[in-house]
Amino acid sequence: LLQKIVQDQRALIEKDTGKPAGEVPQVWALYKEVQGYYEKGMRVPDDVLLLWCDDNWANIRRLPTPEERARPGGAGVYYHFDYVGGPRSYKWLNVTPIPKIWEQMHLAWQYDAKRMWIVNVGDLKPMEVPIEFFLTYAWNPAAWPAERLPEYLRLWAAREFGAEHA
């Protein structure tokens, strides 16, 4: 039934855009139960981007296999800095250290899950440091090897508060 729904959606895309569905960017977020459907064999066309998700605790649940990396749609990651849900919510407080973000997004980069990165940030103010690191790393992962992570925080603090307070 779900695969029929995907086929119907693609037909609607073609009807509404006048283009073949494969020429219109599409994403399938493998979040929570949807990843379970995928693991049990549900598939979408190869031109659809597979968006791998974290476990709501900053651990990417799964990354693409070599066969999945060969799909023309590619792969990406949906990541959380803010989460509301069971068994515990975390808001208004940064609970994801920069090294953890680096580790997980570095894995995503190594496994070619880099076509799209989305981060759920919740409230912006308490997440300034992780948001900026996430975007900086996404822009140029090679510029930020693990050895430079302490330098990142020093540079950020110097810019925000002055070198004497960094």
Label every model-predicted segment.
Residues 54-58, 64-166:
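Structured mid-domain segments that build the active-site/substrate or prosthetic-cofactor binding neighborhood
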Residues 1-72:
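Gly/Pro-rich turn-and-neighbor structural signature
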